[in-house]
């Protein structure tokens, strides 16, 4: 049986979510994207077209579709896509549904891009997958040929919204103050409360909790004053974690039911893992409260995207690497028969740094980790591995990650950034022999902080020595030996301990600069 099909997608999701420098708007935008198809497509459009429809049974369906129970049937929602099936007697509704949905999105959520394509699908196990793949290809092709205008035009005579950069065309209240802002900003900002309510229910199963998630970037526990100087403690971190090879996993699904079931399992695993992270933070709260300047019951983390295999959150920079490490291990654990390997990018930025630029760097760092993952998997003939990369951004940064590392980590010998680093499962014993394992880097950083292997002033001197030539490395190591000190003893790092730099895969490398930079960005007791 062949029926009409409409495939929708949400485009430029990250740009829509992070195109503001107001945390409430970022959180609200994520909620809008996540609920778009259920709230607008299903409730506002399909359920009001005047005929019998089915918008919910896909949530519990386990058997294959052989016929439509209602003239209009929502077959699948997930991963930024929605598939709607329409029987042949009501083919005229296809264009009407697309028109009404896109119009509603433009009116309610200006700035949000959605795409749509139509075709036919055969409700047959083998042909169904082929037809659906063709729809996805067509939808992808449309992205390169259609570029809808979703913002009011800036004529040069209009006021610009301070928060979004769009044309300011409405008024928004901020406490006792009122500001002229863009409607695109207002729709996101006003969705914050609904997003916050759902977050509490998802993570704590109730709204009645004492714990508070920050609603402002300044509330993440940054240390406003410290005896140390140039520590960067007033920083936040943007963390982007993405599942590995998920597209390939979904392409292996031969039926819509398989795709839907996999989507639900992935989403459940992601939420379960993030819940575990929040529980870990609460369990360590005494340590956090000691080192961070947190308001009462304020958590130093705010999730922005927790959906599918995609997680983005902001947190206090001093817990970013350790929290991300724990979360990736939770994703990797095979509890309930589901394991997700992932890669992470962490951009550490000043609180006042442009938020979207920070997110772009986090995304590039995640891509860097994925590139390392693909190369490692191919050379070691393994299917899965997890990697993390990070960078510390201060002042003006280069437009690309490669240029940033070239500018900030250059030396006489080679680039001084050693990452990305491999993340192993909590019970994996192979980590002890891998020089690229994140736990080795953390071990070195902890030893630097404890001061037993060498004095703090020698650690600071080490960074400049690493930028210099081999003669200076030798002199530095000799000075350490003469004072009864040494480089940290780290499993798998014997070659670095002897010479500071060594050749790895035909390129001179050193991990010590990363370890030095991490010293102010890990907390004792979070291991």
Regions found by a protein language model. Name each.
Residues 1-527:
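Regulatory and interdomain segments flanking nucleotide-handling catalytic cores
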């Amino acid at each position: 049986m062949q029926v009409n099909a409409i495939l929708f997608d949400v485009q430029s999701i990250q740009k829509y979510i992070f195109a503001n420098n107001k945390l409430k708007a970022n959180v609200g935008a994520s909620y809008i994207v996540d609920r778009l198809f259920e709230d607008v497509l299903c409730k506002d459009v399909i359920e009001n077209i005047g005929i019998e429809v089915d918008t919910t049974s896909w949530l519990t369906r386990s058997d294959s579709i052989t016929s439509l129970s209602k003239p209009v049937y929502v077959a699948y929602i997930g991963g930024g896509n929605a598939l709607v099936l329409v029987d042949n007697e009501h083919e005229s509704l296809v264009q009407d549904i697309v028109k009404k949905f896109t119009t509603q999105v433009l009116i309610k959520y200006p700035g949000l891009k959605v795409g749509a394509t139509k075709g036919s699908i055969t409700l047959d196990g083998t042909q169904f997958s082929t037809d659906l793949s063709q729809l996805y290809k067509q939808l992808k092709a449309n992205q390169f040929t259609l570029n809808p205008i979703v913002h009011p035009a800036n004529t040069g005579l209009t006021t610009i919204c301070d928060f979004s950069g769009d044309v300011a065309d409405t008024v928004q209240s901020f406490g006792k103050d009122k500001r002229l802002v863009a409607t695109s900003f207002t729709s996101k900002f006003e969705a914050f409360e609904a997003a916050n309510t759902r977050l509490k229910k998802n993570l704590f199963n109730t709204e009645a909790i004492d714990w508070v998630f920050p609603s402002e970037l300044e509330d993440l526990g940054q240390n406003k004053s410290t005896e140390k100087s140039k520590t960067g403690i007033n920083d936040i971190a943007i963390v982007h974690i993405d599942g590995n090879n998920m597209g390939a996993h979904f392409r292996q699904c031969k039926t819509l039911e398989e795709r839907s079931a996999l989507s639900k399992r992935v989403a459940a695993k992601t939420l379960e893992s993030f819940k575990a992270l929040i529980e870990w933070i609460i369990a360590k709260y005494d340590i956090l409260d000691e080192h961070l300047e947190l308001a009462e019951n304020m958590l130093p983390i705010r999730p922005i995207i927790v959906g599918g295999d995609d997680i983005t959150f902001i947190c206090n920079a001093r817990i970013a690497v350790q929290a991300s490490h724990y979360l990736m291990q939770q994703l990797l654990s095979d509890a309930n028969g589901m394991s997700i390997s992932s890669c992470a990018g962490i951009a550490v930025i000043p609180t006042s740094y442009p938020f979207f630029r920070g997110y772009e760097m986090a995304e590039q760092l995640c891509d860097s980790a994925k590139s390392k993952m693909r190369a490692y998997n191919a050379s070691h003939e393994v299917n899965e591995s997890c990697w993390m990369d990070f960078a510390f951004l201060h002042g003006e940064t280069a437009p690309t990650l490669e240029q940033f590392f070239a500018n900030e980590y250059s030396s006489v010998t080679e680039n001084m950034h050693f990452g990305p680093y491999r993340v192993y499962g909590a019970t994996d014993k192979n980590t002890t022999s891998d020089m690229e394992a994140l736990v080795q880097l953390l071990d070195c950083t902890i030893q630097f902080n404890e001061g037993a292997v060498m004095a703090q002033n020698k650690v600071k001197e080490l960074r400049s020595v690493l930028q210099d030539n081999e003669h200076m490395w030798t002199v530095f190591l000799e000075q350490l030996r003469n004072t009864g000190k040494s480089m940290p003893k780290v499993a798998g790092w014997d070659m670095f301990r002897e010479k500071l730099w060594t050749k790895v895969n035909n390129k001179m490398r050193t991990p010590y600069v990363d370890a030095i930079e991490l010293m102010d960005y890990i907390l004792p007791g979070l291991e």
